[in-house]
């Protein structure tokens, strides 16, 4: 049996799936409450949480428009932005002693990767049409199509693995690093490791968001749109 560090979820159950689900829901609730607090009393001159959220949204759109264009960046922001924020909150909650990052579970990061995978294919088919979309998989040279098509299929499926394992591996490694530091010194002392994990959490959320936009751009932008 896999040994797990005690968390607040263990007060209710020691089941692995329950613990992961518990922190998935808890993270979603915390994210919703914080977001609600940021948007509850909107002001013309943003202050506090509203200012933070507007800065985050502006930063995401500023980066995304260079990848997919401003119009599509805004169109797909509800997906990419929500995933970025959720991954960020999921990463951050694991820094708190007694809590566990949902993104430290591969089953959860796999779900996120599958959401992105199916959505960008859905959008590609919707925008370009079924046959035109998959025709791109064959490449521009017809006689190479029998070789290129299966390679492209494998390449797209490998994105599920790379997206899910990249996030899972980094956050799991961060959690193990934090655990070792807390065993060596009191929790109030290792400020530097906490800061490293904080910035790593931001970085992983940023990377996941960027890749979401990159995959969407590859699916919906035609050759003329590049």
UniProtKB/Swiss-Prot annotation:
Residue stretches spanning the membrane: 18-38, 79-99, 105-125, 134-154, 179-199, 201-221
InterPro entries documented for this protein: ATP_syn_F0_a_bact/chloroplast (IPR045082), ATP_synth_F0_asu (IPR000568), ATP_synth_F0_asu_AS (IPR023011), F0_ATP_A_sf (IPR035908)
Molecular function terms from GO: proton-transporting ATP synthase activity, rotational mechanism
Record GO biological process: proton motive force-driven plasma membrane ATP synthesis
Keyword Ion transport assigned: yes
Subcellular location: Cell inner membrane
Membrane topology designation: Multi-pass membrane protein
Source organism superkingdom: Bacteria
GO cellular component: plasma membrane; proton-transporting ATP synthase complex
Predominant subcellular localization, coarse grouping: membrane
Entry keywords, A to Z: ATP synthesis, Cell inner membrane, Cell membrane, CF(0), Hydrogen ion transport, Ion transport, Membrane, Transmembrane, Transmembrane helix, Transport
NCBIfam families to which the protein is assigned, alphabetical: ATP_synt_6_or_A, PRK05815.2-3
Family statement: Belongs to the ATPase A chain family.
Subunit structure and binding partners: F-type ATPases have 2 components, CF(1) - the catalytic core - and CF(0) - the membrane proton channel. CF(1) has five subunits: alpha(3), beta(3), gamma(1), delta(1), epsilon(1). CF(0) has three main subunits: a(1), b(2) and c(9-12). The alpha and beta chains form an alternating ring which encloses part of the gamma chain. CF(1) is attached to CF(0) by a central stalk formed by the gamma and epsilon chains, while a peripheral stalk is formed by the delta and b chains.
Free-text function comment from the UniProt entry: Key component of the proton channel; it plays a direct role in the translocation of protons across the membrane.
Protein name: ATP synthase subunit a
Organism this protein belongs to: Helicobacter pylori (strain G27)
UniProt lineage: Bacteria, Pseudomonadati, Campylobacterota, Epsilonproteobacteria, Campylobacterales
């Amino acid at each position: 049996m896999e040994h797990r560090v005690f968390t607040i979820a263990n007060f209710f159950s020691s089941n692995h799936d329950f613990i992961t689900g518990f922190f998935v829901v808890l993270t979603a609730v915390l994210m919703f409450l914080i977001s609600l607090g940021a948007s509850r009393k909107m002001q013309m001159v943003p202050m506090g949480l509203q200012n933070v959220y507007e800065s985050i949204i502006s930063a995401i759109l500023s980066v995304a428009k260079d990848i997919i264009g401003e119009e599509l960046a805004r169109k797909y922001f509800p997906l990419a932005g929500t995933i970025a924020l959720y991954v960020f909150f999921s990463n951050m909650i694991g820094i708190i002693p007694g809590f566990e990052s949902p993104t430290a579970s591969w089953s959860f990061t796999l779900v996120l990767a599958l959401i992105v995978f199916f959505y960008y294919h859905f959008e590609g088919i919707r925008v370009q049409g079924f046959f035109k979309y998959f025709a791109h998989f064959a490449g521009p040279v017809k006689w190479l199509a029998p070789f290129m098509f299966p390679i492209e299929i494998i390449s797209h499926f490998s994105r599920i693995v790379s997206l899910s394992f990249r996030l899972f591996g980094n956050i799991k490694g961060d959690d193990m690093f934090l655990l070792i530091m807390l065993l060596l010194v009191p929790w109030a002392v290792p400020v530097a490791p906490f800061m490293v994990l904080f910035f790593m959490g931001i970085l992983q959320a940023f990377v996941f968001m960027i890749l979401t936009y990159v995959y969407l751009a590859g699916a919906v932008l035609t050759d003329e749109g590049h």
